Amino acid sequence: MAPNPRKSHPLLKMVNNSLIDLPTPSNISAWWNFGSLLALCLMTQILTGLLLAMHYTADTTLAFSSVAHTCRNVQYGWLIRNMHANGASFFFICIYMHIGRGFYYGSYLHKETWNTGILLLLTLMATAFVGYVLPWGQMSFWGATVITNMFSAIPYIGQTIVEWAWGGFSVDNPTLTRFFALHFLLPFMIAGLTLIHLTFLHESGSNNPLGIVSNCDKIPFHPYYSLKDILGLTLLLLPLTTMALFSPNLLGDPENFTPANPLVTPPHIKPEWYFLFAYAILRSIPNKLGGVLALAASVLVLFLSPLLHKSKQRTMAFRPLSQLLFWTLVANLLILTWIGSQPVEHPFIIIGQLASTTYFIILLILFPITSALENKMLNF
């Protein structure tokens, strides 16, 4: 019998082991769809981004008008731009859901997969930030100024780092040029990291909602989960295209319809919605260095998840107290997101400080305590 090229060809064999004959737990729910949705988001962003880059000019005098030109004069340029801008929002929705799933079901106990995932999140955040600057609108410019300026809080070398990043003494043409270069490069870095992420995942195999070893009950990825993923893709593309076609500017900032002007500061500088929770944590601390450290900690705290896992059970499926705490954390993050979009005024300041404090308390203190308590209640 002739060998099956799918199983013998060096390249096809890799595809086969990752997407066709991959042994997959039979009970994984729709929460396991977000990995493939993120892959779809990445491919969509790279494709639309490439088409946009063909019409974009990375120069302070031309950037804004080149984006306007793309929307007005390029065939379907408006659609490409709207898909790219809103695709970023859906990318973040998917990655936050994906992280939430990992946290809820104890997937972080696959340490290498979890840690590469956090690196992917950080790279995605960097990509989104530099991309937001490219249209050179008011909020693009001032967002770039405020966020890059945070590095000046680093003792001794901070100011030098900021001026080195800017390529001068303020955000200007060199900054825009290098941000465009970075925005082009980073998605390919994300693609590379994704392969590493998957390599680590396929070492151990997927977790499942029960958190138990499922080696005795695995099914092939294709046709079962390939079909399930296609359903997920259509359900993601539907709201994305709807948004791009009907309300493309819903999540954008109106300030970005005004070209960047270094002489006029917008009344309220804020990043895109997906960074607001971290921005609220940054603002809740009156000290500059303290705020920057809290901002970094808000994401880097995820690295500690495997170390803070004290429960004898892997998932939260049968741990009602931890479930309550988890959804409190979700509500807390939504409050932080709302606070980040509000001006720095009386009720919002104290709410932001309380929400920031509870965010860290829940993650670092309450989760381990609750897990230990549940162990005791179950006589583990």
Curated annotation (Swiss-Prot):
Query: Localized where?
Result: Mitochondrion inner membrane
**Residues annotated for a ubiquinone binding in this entry:** H202
Please give one Pfam family short name: Cytochrome_B
How does the record say this protein sits in the membrane? Multi-pass membrane protein
InterPro entries reported for this sequence: Cyt_b/b6_C (IPR005798), Cyt_b/b6_C_sf (IPR036150), Cyt_b/b6_N (IPR005797), Cytb/b6-like_sf (IPR027387), Cytochrome_b (IPR030689), Cytochrome_b_C_euk/bac (IPR048260), Cytochrome_b_N_euk/bac (IPR048259), Di-haem_cyt_TM (IPR016174)
Q: Which cofactors does this gene product need?
A: heme b
Q: Which GO terms describe its molecular function?
A: metal ion binding; ubiquinol-cytochrome-c reductase activity
The record ties this protein, via CDD domains, to:
cytochrome_b_C (cd00290), Cytochrome_b_N (cd00284)
GO cellular component entries = mitochondrial inner membrane; respiratory chain complex III
Q: Which UniProt keywords apply?
A: Electron transport, Heme, Iron, Membrane, Metal-binding, Mitochondrion, Mitochondrion inner membrane, Respiratory chain, Transmembrane, Transmembrane helix, Transport, Ubiquinone
Q: Which residues cross the membrane?
A: 34-54, 78-99, 114-134, 179-199, 227-247, 289-309, 321-341, 348-368
Instruction: Give residues annotated as binding heme b b562.
Output: H84, H183
Annotated GO biological process: mitochondrial electron transport, ubiquinol to cytochrome c
Q: Which residues hold heme b b566?
A: H98, H197
The entry's free-text remark on the cofactor is: Binds 2 heme b groups non-covalently.
The record's function comment reads: Component of the ubiquinol-cytochrome c reductase complex (complex III or cytochrome b-c1 complex) that is part of the mitochondrial respiratory chain. The b-c1 complex mediates electron transfer from ubiquinol to cytochrome c. Contributes to the generation of a proton gradient across the mitochondrial membrane that is then used for ATP synthesis.
Q: How does it assemble?
A: The cytochrome bc1 complex contains 11 subunits: 3 respiratory subunits (MT-CYB, CYC1 and UQCRFS1), 2 core proteins (UQCRC1 and UQCRC2) and 6 low-molecular weight proteins (UQCRH/QCR6, UQCRB/QCR7, UQCRQ/QCR8, UQCR10/QCR9, UQCR11/QCR10 and a cleavage product of UQCRFS1). This cytochrome bc1 complex then forms a dimer.
Q: Please share what else the UniProt entry notes about this protein.
A: Heme 1 (or BL or b562) is low-potential and absorbs at about 562 nm, and heme 2 (or BH or b566) is high-potential and absorbs at about 566 nm.
Q: Identify its protein family.
A: Belongs to the cytochrome b family.
This one is known as: Cytochrome b
Which source organism?
Hydrobates pelagicus
